[in-house]
Amino acid sequence: MTSDPSPWYLGLDTATPWLALALWSPAGADGATDVVHRHAIDLGRDLAGALMGELDAFVRAHDVAPEALRAIGVGVGPGSFTGIRIGIAAALGLGRGLGVAVAGAGTLEALALAGLDDGEVGWSAIDARRGAVYAGRFRRIGDDIDVLEEGRRRPRAEVPPGARLVEGIAPDAFHAARAARAGAPLLPRYG
């Protein structure tokens, strides 16, 4: 593993069928630029069995030593109840083992980051079954997401027809990595 002293933040999101991972090393006082590595794979029901192997391979592929991790951010939903629990349990286990803090990040916001262009306003949604979605309205500004309408479970018909809609893609785990650095609270949003 690398001897690079740069701090790294790990983000992961498992609230959808996708396993989304990110490693982020923010720009330092030395003028270095941010480094972000992303990986997403649709694991569906294989998430629990594949998570740790995928995570280990991802971190090794980018040559980041475990001791370089400063904090871990995890997607807290809304979304799959089981997926959220798997992600939070993995993050807490890693955090405890590495002696680092674990923070929470909204999955709808991570979807907005993945699917909206800079300055764009739109809805992000996750299927909640029975004609409902977990959905919220957001604006992307650079790597930040402004919440315009809080995410919640609602009938799909409440999402305006023709509105910009982000769904069915992997959330951007960079959102969780940034939440790790900010020390966001770890509060699950099961829906």
Predicted regions and their residues:
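Oxyanion-binding and handling regions
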Residues: 1-35, 42-50, 103-191
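A short glycine/serine-rich beta->alpha loop
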Residues: 38-43, 76-80
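Generic beta-strand hydrophobic packing signal
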Residues: 39, 69-72, 189
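Short amphipathic alpha-helical face segments that pack within enzyme cores
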Residues: 50-53, 89, 93, 110
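Phosphate/pyrophosphate-binding loops at sites that engage ATP/ADP/AMP, CoA/4′-phosphopantetheine
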Residues: 55-71, 140
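Residue-level signal for alpha-helix termini/capping positions
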Residues: 60-63, 96, 116-117, 182
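DPxDG-like acidic metal-binding loop motif
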Residues: 70-104
